[in-house]
Amino acid sequence: MKPTLRRKLEALAERHEELERLLSDPKIASDTDRFRTYSRELAQLAPIATTLAEETRTKADLAAAETLRTDPEMRELAEQEIAIAQAHLTTLDEQLQRLLIPQDPRDECNLFLEVRAGTGGDEAAIFAGNLFRMYTRYAERQRWKVEVESDTPGEHGGYKEIIARIVGRGAYSRLKFESGTHRVQRVPATESQGRIHTSAATVAIIPEADEIADISINPADLKIDTFRSSGAGGQHVNKTESAIRITHLPTGVVVESQTERSQHANRDKAMKRLKAQLIESERSQQATAEAMTRKLQVGSGDRSQRIRTYNFPQGRITDHRVENLTLYDLPNIIEGDLDPLIDRLRQEHQAEELARLSNAP
């Protein structure tokens, strides 16, 4: 481990001890807000303190085993103990480095998934449908709930646009690397000459706004329109203007909801999406300079960045943000087996974060 990382760990361990002292102070215990704040911080630092304590014990075991190695009768046993201790220290070192990576407060959030057909006409819409199905299948494997907010079907299948809310623990943490342009190379069903076509679809992953991180929106900045829904709800939705379209005038952001029976319910859904969009837009602008130096623009919603190519003739999927990240398992991945891909992206992100921490003063 680099000395800079070790110093950060030692500082956090000292802070953990300080918090334990503070929480034992009757004055702090009587102050509900401070007690809650310190308790939350202590809980966040506890894994680091526990792992450091285990590292200290393991180093002591290693030193004792090295002392025994000088005894001919104990040498064989000592060598075994040394090997076990060294292996455990390596594991603990890796754990401590991972614990240093700041937790993304949005990781446990639900999210909005937006998939839109890009270049490629009908084939792009079909591919957008393939991507949405891929994420839906993955969500099913994770036991997450998928709620379609709005959709515009393609003329020959798939979707020109589909927006859904995904509800489940850790949903954003797993899918936050999916934002960007996805490209497909394959022979369309309508291609009589057997030529390979290239089409594209864009994906945006937007964390749902937490009530704690809620933002204030001036009602005067909103233009609210109603229209007849074509979504769920049976014949009722076509008889009343229950669907809602909200335009945020300062930014031009437009959101719709038409899946609920009542205008009130659709308005609530649309406002949730609007808040999520505005919060994410502000966060992305603040992170632009930093993101420019990284290969993984996590959750930026940057649709202009080509992140992945799906080559059907070769059964190959390539993620362009990570060197040598090519998997020849496209049939399973497109059916929702995304974990091998997501795990590699998460590892790359952790490596980037550790490099950044190592170089920080």
Curated annotation (Swiss-Prot):
SUPFAM superfamilies on file: Release factor
SMART domains (UniProt xref): PCRF
Keyword Protein biosynthesis in annotation: yes
Compartment list: Cytoplasm
Gene Ontology MF terms: translation release factor activity, codon specific
Keyword Transcription set for record: no
Signal sequence residues: none
Residues carrying N5-methylglutamine: Q235
GO CC term (a single one): cytoplasm
UniProt region (Disordered), positions on chain: 284-306
Post-translational modification: Methylated by PrmC. Methylation increases the termination efficiency of RF1.
Keywords: Cytoplasm, Methylation, Protein biosynthesis
Annotated function: Peptide chain release factor 1 directs the termination of translation in response to the peptide chain termination codons UAG and UAA.
Protein family: Belongs to the prokaryotic/mitochondrial release factor family.
Designated name of the protein: Peptide chain release factor 1
Species: Xylella fastidiosa (strain M12)
Source species taxonomy: Bacteria, Pseudomonadati, Pseudomonadota, Gammaproteobacteria, Lysobacterales
Gene: prfA
